[in-house]
């Protein structure tokens, strides 16, 4: 199953939802698709969707999915990576009035640079990016939070030893 995640902010991502509808109607995508569409105004015709989900519903849907297509929300990305799911990030872009700036592009590129996921910036790339995400062996996501905690604990322990 492909799980599309568009988050909870006030911004739409109709461009992606329409493209997925088109791909399903042309049999480019044949597997089940489910979407969390947030505040997008386009309502999919060829796949099921909800606007919003509880955290429990979200986590259960991530677990059932094989691949996630998500806006570039850090929480969504990290949840998918921790669940060892293939991820295609489709960031909202300022030029399409999908966000006020291109910070989602910056986030997507940072995760892609570490080989955690695949980024898709334009509609004509999505089919190839989906195939690439299915074939790629990604690096295992390691939370930087744990590294910071270890550094702090190491520092505290060294300070106590020196006293």
Feature roles, as predicted:
Residues 1-163:
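Nucleotide-activated sugar donor-binding and catalytic core shared by glycosyltransferases
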């Amino acid at each position: 199953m492909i799980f599309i995640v568009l988050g909870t902010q006030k911004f739409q991502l109709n461009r992606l939802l329409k493209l997925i509808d088109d791909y399903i109607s042309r049999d480019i995508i044949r597997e089940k698709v489910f979407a969390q569409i947030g505040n997008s105004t386009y309502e999919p015709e060829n796949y099921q969707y909800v606007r919003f989900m509880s955290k429990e519903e979200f986590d259960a849907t991530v677990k059932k999915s094989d691949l996630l297509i998500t806006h570039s929300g850090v929480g969504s990305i990290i949840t998918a990576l921790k669940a060892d799911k293939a991820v295609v990030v489709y960031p909202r872009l300022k030029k399409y009035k999908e966000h006020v700036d291109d910070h989602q592009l910056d986030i997507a590129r940072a995760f892609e640079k570490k080989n955690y996921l695949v980024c898709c910036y334009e509609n004509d790339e999505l089919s190839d990016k989906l195939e690439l995400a299915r074939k790629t062996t990604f690096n295992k996501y390691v939370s930087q939070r744990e590294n910071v905690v270890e550094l702090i604990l190491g520092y505290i322990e060294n300070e106590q030893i020196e006293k």
